């Protein structure tokens, strides 16, 4: 395991079988080592894994654990090509501000907790901008932590494209904790 305590292993076949690729650091393109990915073992850290090279396409956040089939990480298929370690909040502090309009305009809600439904909790249909003041967060396009995922680090996001989304469809979010 690396000095930082991060390690992830990708396997071509289900249940940790077949050829495998180990990583303890960010990798922009590992698809040359594996033709597909059907299972993953995260031995240290929390990882963002991406469908395409250069950290593009669908992204999935995987905390420490075993994922014997791609459905276990909510994958759409067996294609993964890049990965990066997620840097978690030091001190365990989390704070997020979400806005109903772009450029931090309109109604603002501040939270330090996970939210399974922004409609139920904040009476908002979409998130058009946000400020991550503390910690790392995941936005989900559907309620109850489902659908496409977006990783947000500590910074300001003036519009959805800033966090990698094509639209403001954010229906739930949660803190990344280990």
Curated annotation (Swiss-Prot):
Tell me the InterPro entries matching this sequence: Beta/Gamma-Crystallin, Beta/gamma_crystallin, G_crystallin-like
Note down the stretches annotated as region Connecting peptide: 88-93
What are the protein's GO molecular function terms? structural constituent of eye lens
Q: Which SUPFAM superfamilies match?
A: gamma-Crystallin-like
Q: Which PROSITE patterns match?
A: CRYSTALLIN_BETA_GAMMA (PS50915)
Q: GO terms for biological process? A: lens development in camera-type eye; visual perception
Pfam families the record matches: Crystall
Q: Does the keyword Ribonucleoprotein apply?
A: no
| Ranges for domain Beta/gamma crystallin 'Greek key' | 6-44, 45-87, 94-134, 135-177
Residue list for modification N-acetylserine: 2
User: What UniProt keywords are attached to this protein's entry?
Assistant: Acetylation, Eye lens protein, Repeat
| Domain of life per record | Eukaryota
Region N-terminal arm, as annotated, extends over 2-5
Report the family membership.
Belongs to the beta/gamma-crystallin family.
Q: What is known of its domains?
A: Has a two-domain beta-structure, folded into four very similar Greek key motifs.
What assembly does the database describe for this protein? Monomer.
Could you tell me what this protein does? Answer: Crystallins are the dominant structural components of the vertebrate eye lens.
The protein, known as: Gamma-crystallin S
Q: Which organism is it from?
A: Bos taurus (Bovine)
Q: What lineage is this protein's organism placed in?
A: Eukaryota, Metazoa, Chordata, Craniata, Vertebrata
Name of the coding gene: CRYGS
């Amino acid at each position: 395991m690396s000095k930082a305590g991060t390690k992830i292993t990708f396997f071509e076949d289900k249940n940790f079988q077949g050829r495998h690729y180990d990583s303890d650091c960010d990798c922009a393109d590992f698809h040359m080592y594996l033709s597909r990915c059907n299972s993953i073992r995260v031995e240290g850290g929390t990882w963002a894994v991406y469908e395409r090279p250069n950290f593009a396409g669908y992204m999935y956040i995987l905390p420490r654990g075993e994922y014997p089939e791609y459905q276990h990480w909510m994958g759409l298929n067996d294609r993964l090509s890049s990965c990066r370690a997620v840097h978690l909040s030091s001190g365990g502090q989390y704070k997020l501000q979400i806005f109903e309009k772009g450029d931090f305009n309109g109604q603002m809600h501040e939270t330090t907790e996970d939210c399974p439904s922004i409609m139920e909790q904040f009476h908002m249909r979409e998130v058009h901008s946000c400020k991550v003041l503390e910690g790392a967060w995941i936005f989900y396009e559907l309620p109850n932590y489902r659908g496409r995922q977006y990783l947000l680090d500590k910074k300001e996001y003036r519009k959805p494209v800033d966090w990698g989304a094509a639209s403001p469809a954010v229906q739930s979010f949660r803190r990344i904790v280990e």
